[in-house]
């Protein structure tokens, strides 16, 4: 019997252990990265970035109909189950206004990344339409290559380059656009040194030496920014006030619980009408996202039922 992964959203497709035989049929490259655990069970060599990439290719093809997916070396290779959880919890949040998950929701992904992971999952699971913003031209090119290589995605996902240094929504949300929600996986660290130290910790935890290849890739804009996660989300909160009537829910992942109090204070300062925290768990890993809106219940109901 398959063991369940604790804490995943009920609609998440990844509750059971990976069916490696099936995934290897979907992506034969994965076979070379299989290992045996001390208990004699087949697993994937998660310390090898090529193995993680091969696993992701198989998962995205098998569960989300993304037949062609790849990312350049050095970019983050995201764990698919955790990313799917954010999408499913976001769907529940959008459902509270009308009682059903909107089938034609318009979502803005801040920092879509080279992997384009949130739009790929959201389009398949709910038929949503996505706009993805990105500061890195290389990441944008990679995401566009994924979209172009998979039939139907061009109609559902559009990308925009953030050209304004330090801006988040400004320059991305156009004057007459409306979004049901924004989502974001913000840069975690406050400096390159802190990002390196974080990778070093993960390396030690996996028993790797410094020369071992890592699954902890990531470009500067993916891993760190001035002031770290709190400052980034605070900036997002400040800018969100200017788009209060164009966006129903603003949301962002928050990596550490201790980062929440200053964010709650910032949300009070800008006059957020409602703030929600959604806790998530994947195995031992705890995470959460916060959501805020400047619309009351009636305004949100009207927003969901608007002409599109």
Curated annotation (Swiss-Prot):
Tell me the function of this protein. Answer: Specifically methylates the adenine in position 1618 of 23S rRNA.
The uppermost taxa in this organism's lineage are: Bacteria, Pseudomonadati, Pseudomonadota, Gammaproteobacteria, Enterobacterales
Q: What is its EC number?
A: 2.1.1.181
**Under the GO molecular function aspect, what terms does this record hold?**
23S rRNA (adenine(1618)-N(6))-methyltransferase activity
Keywords on record? Cytoplasm, Methyltransferase, rRNA processing, S-adenosyl-L-methionine, Transferase
What Pfam families does the annotation carry? Methyltransf_10
- HAMAP family per the record? 23SrRNA_methyltr_F
- NCBIfam families named in the record: PRK11727.1 (NF008725)
Reaction(s) catalysed (UniProt annotation): adenosine(1618) in 23S rRNA + S-adenosyl-L-methionine = N(6)-methyladenosine(1618) in 23S rRNA + S-adenosyl-L-homocysteine + H(+)
- Where would you find this protein in the cell? Cytoplasm
Question: Looking at its record, which EC class is this enzyme?
Answer: transferase
Family statement drawn from the similarity comment of this UniProt entry: Belongs to the methyltransferase superfamily. METTL16/RlmF family.
Q: What are the GO BP annotations of this UniProt entry? A: rRNA base methylation
| PANTHER family linked to this entry | RNA N6-ADENOSINE-METHYLTRANSFERASE METTL16 (PTHR13393:SF0), SAM-DEPENDENT METHYLTRANSFERASE (PTHR13393)
What organism does this protein naturally occur in? Shigella flexneri
Instruction: Give the protein's recorded name.
Output: Ribosomal RNA large subunit methyltransferase F
- One Gene Ontology CC term in the entry: cytoplasm
UniProt keyword Transferase present: yes
Q: What is its main location?
A: cytoplasm
